[in-house]
Amino acid sequence: MFNASVTGRMGSDPEMRYINEGTPVVNFSIAHNWLYRDEKLVKWVRCSIWGELAEKANETLHKGDLVKVSGTVTFRPWTRQDGTSTEEVELRASGFEKEEPSGLAEIP
């Protein structure tokens, strides 16, 4: 495990649930885009936020939003339906903030 910040677009609205004795947890995925040798690549990062911050995220984040999420990264192995193995990147977030798209400028 290690700490990281990832910026990407929300793939869907957050999914809120309550566990144990009412602890709020919100889950969502963001698409992180980057260029490598003139090839546009996308990696989906699964995020979870717990506690009061989860409630705030559920109220303020929406599908399509550009968001920066910071927290602890883990890799969860799983097996696809075709039997091949892969890993899902998961980020247990300790913070988030909405971002403004880069490259946009206001014309005077």
What does each model-found stretch correspond to?
Residues 1-108:
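Single-stranded nucleic acid-binding surfaces, predominantly the OB-fold ssDNA-binding core
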